[in-house]
Amino acid sequence: MSDTTTLTIEALFQRVESIFLRAGLNAVQSGALARVITAGERDACKSHGIYRIEGALRTVKAAKVKPDAIPEVAEDDGTAIVKVNAMGGFANPAFELGLPALAERAKRLGLAALVINDCTHFSALWPEVEGLTSNGLAGLVMCPSYSTVAPTGGTKPLLGTNPFAFGWPRKDTSPYVFDFATSVAARGEIELHRRARKSLPEGWAVDADGNPTTDPEAALAGAMLPFGGHKGSAIGTMIELLAGIMIGDLTSPEVLDYLGTTTLAPFHGELIVAFSPEAFAKGRPGDPFQRAEVLFEAIIGQGARLPSGRRFAARAKSESEGITLTAAEMAGLDRLLEKGLDAVS
């Protein structure tokens, strides 16, 4: 008997979507969640793949997210801001709903922003970024989380892991994309270390007393650290301001107060900013996309690689060969499909 199973991307999507439908989520929520989770597995981004299903279901079971939510786009007020209310559901369907209006407005005005309010967000941000680059737009995406990161010089959780992503469209090749937490590592990475009973690298976290630790359990009970010391701390604070306070949504401390735990997916807002390179470069010499390629080629020419290169390579492999899951992963999917919300506590 094989220890692995290989599925097509579509087959995995259907299986994941069925799990969410079985758990009582409507088609709008289930489809969007299944797309982003399948994309994570497709790109070998395991910390944002099927691993995330249980957390999403726990959040539904705890009644902290509405499984039947239908997101709504606010009436066009003539500004560059598109607003979508997730209506207490997940962020992913809200983004899918708002993307066409965001892209149209950014191309017409040169710059536009999508504000998503009242949403639960558990996924990576590169799917949003790639939604922009596929429309020929550059983009910035950010959101808070819940308090799990100590500010530089502090010892207690205050900031969120506060992910931040950027994308630049490229012709006839994969876009330039980076997506990272403003903590040293994503919280999901610490969870994966805990599950694998592996020690953390030094400098990732402190324990509940503020002492450095490499124990994942102690780290989860303590605080993570920002990347780059005071620089990461400042960027994390900026995200609290822009994607929390400025858009009238929750900051990471407020999210933690609302949830009362870090075991559920966080409830907050999300900010997506789209730029038209042609509009910004209009009237200036040179094509912005060609000039960008000169920069990218210079980076590669030094033996460096562009961010997300491994993810895009994994995507190409999955598209040609399928997605391979272990026996344990397949059993986990079967259990979730059979039991629905009863599979999580």
Swiss-Prot record:
The record's subunit annotation is:
Homodimer.
Which InterPro entries does the record associate with it? Mal/L-sulf/L-lact_DH-like_ah, Mal/L-sulf/L-lact_DH-like_NADP, Mal/L-sulfo/L-lacto_DH-like_sf, Malate/L-lactate_DH-like
Concerning Gene3D superfamilies, the annotation shows:
1.10.1530.10, Hypothetical oxidoreductase yiak, domain 2 (3.30.1370.60)
Query: What name is this protein filed under?
Result: Delta(1)-pyrroline-2-carboxylate reductase
- List ligand-binding residues for substrate: R52, T161, R187, G188
Keywords of this protein's UniProt record, alphabetized? NADP, Oxidoreductase
Q: Does the keyword NADP apply?
A: yes
Catalytic EC class: oxidoreductase
Induction entry = Is up-regulated when the bacterium is grown on t4LHyp or t3LHyp as sole carbon source.
Binding sites annotated in the UniProt record for NADP(+): 121-125, 179-181, 230-231, 305-311
Its function, per the record, reads: Catalyzes the reduction of Delta(1)-pyrroline-2-carboxylate (Pyr2C) to L-proline, using NADPH as the electron donor. Is likely involved in a degradation pathway that converts trans-3-hydroxy-L-proline (t3LHyp) to L-proline, which would allow A.tumefaciens to grow on t3LHyp as a sole carbon source.
Catalytic reaction equation(s):
L-proline + NAD(+) = 1-pyrroline-2-carboxylate + NADH + H(+); L-proline + NADP(+) = 1-pyrroline-2-carboxylate + NADPH + H(+)
Q: Which organism is it from?
A: Agrobacterium fabrum (strain C58 / ATCC 33970) (Agrobacterium tumefaciens (strain C58))
- One GO MF term attached to the UniProt entry: oxidoreductase activity
Q: EC annotation? A: 1.5.1.49
Q: What's one Pfam family here?
A: Ldh_2
Q: Which residues form the active site?
A: S47, H48, E189
